[in-house]
Amino acid sequence: GRGERHDQQCKYQDNVRRGLDWLTAQEVGIGDMRGKGNMYDHGIAALALVEAYGVTKDPDLRPMAQGVIDFIVDSQHEEGGWRYKPGERGDLSVSGWMVMALASGEMSGIPIPKKTWEGVRGFLEIVGGGKDGGSYGYTDSPGKANSGKHAMNAVGFFCAQLTRSSANAAKAFESALILEGAGFNLADIYYAYYGTLAAYQHQGPVWRKWIKKMQAEYL
């Protein structure tokens, strides 16, 4: 948010550099950032690395940025999502981090296969539901036992925005209504994170209401 980077003099240059040094040292295989964890760890680490490359275009980061993206592409399930292990049938929570990393990679100049994006859009259809497809569940469409939570609606809405799957006005309106109805809630930090991303992308009254309450909570 501040534009701090490891390759130019700035207030937190050393912190960012040391953080990147530590992060790159965690690679356990070509492009594999899971460490002793799972695909959650990989997705979050991949997002950080690709963002660092995208901001700086540091050629030393390019091979690793490409590697972590390739690992995501190769780990995608045939239905288009991701879960704890490579190739496992997806859930929307883990998949959200992969979609963010892929979108960041594409914006940074790393090519993403068309088939990968088609898979993501297909997965969003699987976990989508509601009247116009703008409500999202965890591993299945809302209405089933493990679906329909506010956080998952926010993740699905944001992923749809990143993949341009929310171009359908009715679908986007339904997603926005759910987000607006739930409102900002700092007690659920995961929902607050994704809800902020989705509300900001959507803009309009939904974002204005969201940011007003968020500022009151934080400031």
Give residue spans per PLM region.
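An alpha-helical repeat/solenoid feature that recognizes helix-turn-helix modules
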Residues: G1-N15, G29-D70, D74-G119, I126-L177, ...
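Membrane helical hairpin/interfacial module
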Residues: R18-L20
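Patatin-like phospholipase
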Residues: L23
